[in-house]
Swiss-Prot record:
GO molecular function: nickel cation binding
InterPro entries xrefs: UreF, UreF_sf
Xref: Gene3D superfamilies: Urease accessory protein UreF (1.10.4190.10)
One term under GO cellular component: cytoplasm
Complexes and interactors: UreD, UreF and UreG form a complex that acts as a GTP-hydrolysis-dependent molecular chaperone, activating the urease apoprotein by helping to assemble the nickel containing metallocenter of UreC. The UreE protein probably delivers the nickel.
Protein name, UniProt field: Urease accessory protein UreF
Sorted UniProt keywords: Chaperone, Cytoplasm, Nickel insertion
Annotated compartments: Cytoplasm
Its biological purpose: Required for maturation of urease via the functional incorporation of the urease nickel metallocenter.
Main localization, broad class: cytoplasm
Coiled coil ranges: none
One Pfam family per UniProt: UreF
Family statement drawn from the similarity comment of this UniProt entry: Belongs to the UreF family.
């Protein structure tokens, strides 16, 4: 039986992953706007293909694998290794806009989390960012808070995957444009058809060889976005 505190922790998780949580995700397409401009993404089906590319490459080998690794490191008190993940995931990003966008979102998450929760590691993370010892990353911040809230690993992975994809889908729906109901149908399909496979893949990856491993296509689109004179999104 779940305790009252467990329900409150679950509500906290729902709050921080809500689309209205003010961390700035509404400003980013992470390269998909380039595909929209080139008419590679123009309807619901083509958007799903682009989102699957993002989910199976950058999100899987970056954020989700980082969360998985932090859940392994923190119980062993390997704190310095967690800060190394922040460094690694920042250095591996080739596209400047995407790298800076992730950094801004991560820093905002750390700032707001510290205003809402009493978590020593997040306080330390904020100080490291202030001292320029860390950059700030959404996956690192989320993993630290999820463990503070006693959220299990799989729930944390599914939740981060959902919140990231839902926010990105809503942004792309505005850009194409598609109707809001169509956007919800896309999110629903992604959840029920593809999420299980992606989460299963996380557990089969090796951190040393697979972390931040990407195919070049999406990163090229993200770098091309930097030279786009008229755009809706910062990345």
């Amino acid at each position: 039986m779940m305790l009252n505190s467990d329900y409150l922790n679950l509500l906290d998780l729902m709050q921080i992953t809500n689309a209205n949580f003010p961390i700035g995700t509404f400003s980013h397409s992470f390269g998909i706007e380039t595909y929209i401009r080139k008419d590679i993404v123009f309807d619901g089906d083509s958007l799903i293909r682009a989102l699957l590319l993002y989910m199976n490459e950058q999100l899987l080998h970056g954020d989700l694998l980082a969360i998985y690794q932090i859940f392994k490191l923190l119980p062993k008190q390997k704190i310095n290794a967690i800060w190394e993940i922040d460094q690694m995931i920042n250095f591996q990003g080739l596209a400047r806009e995407t790298r800076e966008g992730q950094r801004r979102i991560g820093q905002q998450m750390v700032k707001i989390y510290n205003e809402l929760f009493d978590c020593e590691l997040l306080v330390e993370y904020a100080q490291r960012i202030k001292d320029r010892k860390s950059y700030g990353n959404p996956a690192v911040a989320f993993a630290l808070l999820a463990m503070h809230l006693k959220i299990d690993l799989k729930t944390a992975l599914y939740t981060h995957l959902y919140s990231t994809v839902a926010a990105l889908t809503q942004n792309c729906v505005r850009a194409i444009p598609l109707g809001q109901v169509k956007g919800q149908k896309i999110i629903h399909k992604l959840k029920h058809v593809y999420f299980d496979d992606i989460i299963d893949k996380v557990f089969s990856l090796d951190f040393k060889t697979d972390f931040c491993k990407n195919i070049p296509g999406l990163e090229i689109a993200q770098m091309e976005h930097e030279d786009t004179p008229v755009r809706l999104f910062m990345s």
